[in-house]
């Protein structure tokens, strides 16, 4: 009898607690529709069920805020200004938003759970962002670990991007086997050496990532990306490979891909100052876009140089393009430094890391490096080394432009 009474009492307590929780939830959490007031413009504002993240709500209503990490809170790009509602800023946002910015209402849309009516402000250019379903034209190796993905924009459509801009590419849940990758024989040596074909990428959720465009605005009808495969580091061989890079490497001509854009902040300044471009690896993409735009579209007479770091001749690409630009433009010079040239390369050019080569062979004897504009994109270690070198030369932050795809 005591056991039965105990079970009954326990059940009643659980039921009572459940009722209390549901009652509290009904009072504290808005489970009905809420209103998102955008820029105090009724045509841009909308109503939606409460509970989702602000980034997702905006996207579902055709407003695409930049989010290079796909809403994971790590890139800090999906900034919005919240005037009313939104609650307190979260610890996950504080590494991207300063105290001053937080006081002004700056938040990360991917971290804001919408539980009440909001009043927000968005830059006007966001409303020019669109989605397109593109078709893969080609997806070819340009280096051992870098593919050039070329996409066809739908007929009659235009992606109104600026040189240095980027798009976001979407992937549905998928499984990718590296053994199915089409890697030309000339690049297979390192793939076999490090047993990379054994990897698989299994993704259960839709994914979004950002990539800088390698084409420039007058290369119409296409989007061109340089994508480096993100394999697990040798020190952590059991780590999962890169989600989006694995997906992109699996794409074949004729496949359909959804992109959104354009986005960007890595734009050239409209001045007459000398431009120095510094790149490495897949950081080639915005370098190519910028340099082609300056010389082929704008016919710039600014002094321009491009310094690119690669491991060996096999990792160099777009050589003919830049050689031709150099031959056609007296104001442009480009230089490559190989950090690990192979015997078969018969390399007679610069060797070493690109920041050292740039310093020793150009900037050290430059009359005023602090007056130049520096545009860079490459691996994080390269970026850090270049920035330190430039700071040591007295270059101010305002003249150092970085496309920080490596975080």
Curated annotation (Swiss-Prot):
GO biological process: sodium ion transport
GO-annotated molecular function: 2 iron, 2 sulfur cluster binding; electron transfer activity; metal ion binding; oxidoreductase activity, acting on NAD(P)H, quinone or similar compound as acceptor
A single Gene Ontology CC term: plasma membrane
Function: NQR complex catalyzes the reduction of ubiquinone-1 to ubiquinol by two successive reactions, coupled with the transport of Na(+) ions from the cytoplasm to the periplasm. The first step is catalyzed by NqrF, which accepts electrons from NADH and reduces ubiquinone-1 to ubisemiquinone by a one-electron transfer pathway.
Originating species: Yersinia enterocolitica serotype O:8 / biotype 1B (strain NCTC 13174 / 8081)
Protein name, as recorded: Na(+)-translocating NADH-quinone reductase subunit F
Gene that encodes it: nqrF
Domain 2Fe-2S ferredoxin-type residue range list: 32-126
Cofactor note: Binds 1 [2Fe-2S] cluster.
Subunit structure: Composed of six subunits; NqrA, NqrB, NqrC, NqrD, NqrE and NqrF.
Catalysed transformations (reactions): a ubiquinone + n Na(+)(in) + NADH + H(+) = a ubiquinol + n Na(+)(out) + NAD(+)
């Amino acid at each position: 009898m005591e056991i039965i009474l105990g079970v009954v009492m326990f059940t009643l307590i659980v039921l009572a607690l459940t009722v209390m929780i549901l009652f509290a939830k009904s009072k504290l959490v808005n489970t009905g529709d809420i209103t998102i007031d955008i820029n105090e413009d009724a045509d841009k504002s909308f109503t939606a069920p409460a509970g989702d993240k602000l980034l997702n709500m905006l996207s579902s209503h055709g407003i695409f805020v930049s989010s290079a990490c796909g809403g994971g809170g790590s890139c800090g790009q999906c900034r919005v200004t919240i005037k009313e509602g939104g609650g307190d800023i979260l610890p996950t946002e504080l590494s991207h938003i300063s105290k001053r910015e937080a006081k002004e209402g700056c938040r990360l849309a991917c971290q804001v759970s919408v539980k009440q009516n909001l009043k927000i402000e968005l830059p006007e250019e966001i409303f020019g962002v669109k989605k397109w379903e593109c078709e893969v034209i080609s997806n070819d190796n340009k280096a051992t670990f870098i593919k050039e993905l070329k996409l066809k924009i739908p007929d009659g459509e235009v992606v109104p991007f600026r040189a240095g801009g980027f798009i976001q590419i979407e992937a549905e849940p998928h499984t990718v086997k590296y053994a199915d990758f089409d890697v030309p024989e000339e690049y297979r040596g390192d793939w076999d050496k490090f047993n990379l074909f054994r990897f698989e990428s299994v993704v259960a959720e839709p994914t979004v990532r950002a990539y800088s465009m390698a084409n420039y605005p007058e290369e119409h009808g296409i989007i061109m990306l340089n994508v480096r495969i993100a394999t697990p580091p040798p020190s952590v061989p059991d780590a999962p490979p890169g989600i989006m890079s694995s997906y992109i490497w699996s794409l074949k001509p004729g496949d359909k891909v959804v992109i959104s854009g354009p986005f960007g902040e890595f734009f050239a300044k409209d001045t007459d100052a000398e431009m120095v471009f510094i790149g490495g690896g897949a950081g080639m993409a915005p370098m190519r876009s910028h340099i082609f735009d300056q010389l082929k579209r704008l016919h710039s007479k600014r002094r321009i140089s491009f310094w690119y770091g690669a491991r060996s001749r096999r990792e160099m690409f777009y050589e003919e393009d830049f050689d031709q630009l150099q031959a056609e433009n007296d104001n442009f010079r480009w230089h490559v430094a190989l950090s690990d040239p192979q015997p078969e390369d018969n390399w007679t050019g610069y060797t070493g890391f690109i920041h050292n080569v740039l310093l020793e062979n150009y900037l050290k004897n430059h009359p005023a490096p602090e007056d130049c504009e520096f545009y860079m994109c490459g691996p994080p270690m390269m970026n850090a080394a270049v920035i330190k070198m430039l700071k040591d030369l007295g270059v101010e932050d305002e003249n150092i432009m970085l496309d920080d795809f490596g975080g």
